[in-house]
Amino acid sequence: MSEPNPKAFPLADAALTQQILDIVQQATHLRQLKKGANEATKTLNRGISEFIIMAADAEPIEILLHLPLLCEDKNVPYIFVPSKVALGRACGVSRPVISASVTSNDASQLKDQIIQMKDKIERLLI
């Protein structure tokens, strides 16, 4: 695999990537996940996004670089994972996914895990 794009900041390490993809997989089963850059943008605009995951190997990376700006405006944490193929698998689809949004649901059993993950991502953004 090639070097990740330097514009992809903050990039999750291997352990954090695994945790993120686990949460993404669980969120998929609970219908708390939106896949793709367009749907991620919609969740941000509607204010229902908990955090945004983007693939660092998106080609060209510029197709999702509007998301970090929007995330900062809306105060939503965001993170890059190394592989769009792995993100696609975690999302439960057979195609690569370059961006995903975990959405909020107060009654969800994922709530505690989502809060912990948001804290970890926010620490990387400092």
UniProtKB/Swiss-Prot annotation:
It comes from Yarrowia lipolytica (strain CLIB 122 / E 150). It comes from the Eukaryota. GO terms for molecular function: RNA binding; U3 snoRNA binding; U4 snRNA binding. Component of the U3 snoRNP particle. Binds to the C'/D and B/C motifs in U3 snoRNA. Component of the 25S U4/U6.U5 tri-snRNP particle, a subcomplex of the spliceosome. Binds to the 5' stem-loop of U4 snRNA. InterPro entries: eL8/uL1-like, H/ACA_rnp_Nhp2-like, Ribosomal_eL30-like_sf, Ribosomal_eL8-like_CS, Ribosomal_eL8/eL30/eS12/Gad45, Ribosomal_eL8/Nhp2. GO terms for cellular component: box C/D methylation guide snoRNP complex; nucleolus; precatalytic spliceosome; small-subunit processome; U4/U6 x U5 tri-snRNP complex. Signal peptide: none annotated. This is 13 kDa ribonucleoprotein-associated protein. GO terms for biological process: box C/D sno(s)RNA 3'-end processing; maturation of SSU-rRNA; maturation of SSU-rRNA from tricistronic rRNA transcript (SSU-rRNA, 5.8S rRNA, LSU-rRNA); mRNA splicing, via spliceosome; snoRNA guided rRNA 2'-O-methylation. It is found in: Nucleus, Nucleolus. Belongs to the eukaryotic ribosomal protein eL8 family. The keyword RNA-binding applies. Keywords: mRNA processing, mRNA splicing, Nucleus, Ribonucleoprotein, Ribosome biogenesis, RNA-binding, rRNA processing, Spliceosome. The gene is SNU13. SUPFAM superfamilies: L30e-like. Common component of the spliceosome and rRNA processing machinery. In association with the spliceosomal U4/U6.U5 tri-snRNP particle, required for splicing of pre-mRNA. In association with box C/D snoRNPs, required for processing of pre-ribosomal RNA (rRNA) and site-specific 2'-O-methylation of substrate RNAs. Essential for the accumulation and stability of U4 snRNA, U6 snRNA, and box C/D snoRNAs.
